[in-house]
């Protein structure tokens, strides 16, 4: 949103288009890293926000996410939080076991923030994977987090994860799968 269009310009357009849709449409602000921008998106009419405070320690992540959860209540908007470190498919940030979500921390995070959905890290990465590469997901970790939190779980970095991985994610408890981490530039759309 920030790089492409101000939320007070895009929200009314999308809401108007959503009224014409035959299915429910959510206007989601994904990977909000700044409290001010997240609050602005909610004020401007976004129906959900994803708080990405995973760069902070657990306490900082809880604090920021809880603040947005409390703020979002007045708009009846949903809030997704993220715990664990999502890798990147390029550069030196490949997913490693120590970057995956800790199930006990996931439970604490969910309880202390009051989020509606939880994005977890269990082997996926943002961005496009190298050709022919299929990530290895830790389905036992996913299962344990689902059993502990008993809440909707989110997979970020679903693009290129492979059909079998996606099917198993749903079987093991993923409720939302995010594809395409970044928007294409206008020149890519022609």
Language model features with spans:
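Active-site cofactor/substrate anionic-group-binding motifs, chiefly glycine-
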Residues: 1-37
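Hydrophobic faces of well-ordered beta-strands that scaffold small-molecule active sites
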Residues: 25-29, 49-51, 79-81, 118-120, ...
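Short, surface-exposed connector motifs at secondary-structure boundaries
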Residues: 19-24, 147-152, 171-173
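Single conserved hydrophobic/aromatic residue that forms the stacking wall/gate
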Residues: 181-190
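Catalytic cores of alpha/beta
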Residues: 36-40, 160-172
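Alpha/beta enzyme core
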Residues: 16-20, 34-51, 55, 66, ...
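Catalytic alpha/beta core domains of metabolic enzymes, predominantly
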Residues: 117-167
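Short, acidic/turn-prone active-site loops that include or flank metal/cofactor-
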Residues: 1-2, 54-56, 180
């Amino acid at each position: 949103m920030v790089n492409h269009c101000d939320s007070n310009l895009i929200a009314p357009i999308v809401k108007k288009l959503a009224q014409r849709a035959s299915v429910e449409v959510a206007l989601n602000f994904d990977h909000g890293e700044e409290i001010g921008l997240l609050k602005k998106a909610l004020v401007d009419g976004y129906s959900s926000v994803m708080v990405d405070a995973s760069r902070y320690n657990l306490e900082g992540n809880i604090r920021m996410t809880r603040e947005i959860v409390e703020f979002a209540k007045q708009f009846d908007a949903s809030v997704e939080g993220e715990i664990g470190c999502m890798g990147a498919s390029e550069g030196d940030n490949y997913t490693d076991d120590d970057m995956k979500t800790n199930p006990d921390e996931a439970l604490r995070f969910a309880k202390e923030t009051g989020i509606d959905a939880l994005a977890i890290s269990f082997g996926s990465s943002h961005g496009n994977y190298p050709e022919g590469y299929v990530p290895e997901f830790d389905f036992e970790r996913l299962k344990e987090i689902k059993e502990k939190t008993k809440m909707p779980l989110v997979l970020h970095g679903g693009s290129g994860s492979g059909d079998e991985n996606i099917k198993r994610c749903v079987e093991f408890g993923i409720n939302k799968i995010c594809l395409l981490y970044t928007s294409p530039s206008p020149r890519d759309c022609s």
